[in-house]
Amino acid sequence: MATPGRPWAQARSAYRASEVLRRVTGRRRDPGPQSNGPGREDARAPGRLARLLRQLRAEAASRSEVPRLLKLVERAGAGAAGAGERTGAHSRGSVCSVCGEPRGRATYPAGVLEVSERRLQEGLAAVREELGAEIEALRAELRAELDALRALLPPPPPSPPARREPRAVPRAAPRGPTLLRTLGTVSALVAASRPADDAPDGPAECGAHRAPARKNHKKMPVPPGAPQGGGD
């Protein structure tokens, strides 16, 4: 008597095995370069194969004969392992496209970074030269347009003459001390230029020399014994 649910489990196992076989066949038909490292689906494929093999072996253990589906899955697993070994041997001397370090699963051969860098430098040099030529042409065109605009503009008005700033007049020093010093100097010179005979004998005669003596109209008392009159 058949166990209930067994056909559904077999159908599900067959579907999984067919999916695995389809993916393995697709990888064999497309030998082009893959991305660095296995993808998410490819990384899960060996685990799925292992689970499927365990399920099929458990089912085959309950039967006396090994089903044909188990043989197909084992053959597909062996083919996937051989393809992985060939890919590893092919990419053994390759380097990473990002960091340049040797990696087992890299798809770029050794030396490709140097070639890519050289081509990139050549391309950059060509672009730089082309841009420099275009910039020079634009500069010449702008210079010609500016010259034409300057020719159309009216001449500028004459600039006014430069104003001279008034010169600062030095302020006069106070006259009092200077005048006193000048008078003192003149008095000293006059006193030094007089002869020695005309020098006054005392301070009383200084005023008589400077100004004539005024005539005294008052009668002076005559001492006794003195001649009277204004004779010679």
Curated annotation (Swiss-Prot):
Residues 211-220 have a biased composition (Basic residues). Belongs to the FAM246 family. Residues 19-31 have a biased composition (Basic and acidic residues). It comes from the Eukaryota. Residues 19-47, 80-101, 151-179, 191-232 are annotated as: Disordered. This is Protein FAM246B. It comes from Homo sapiens (Human).
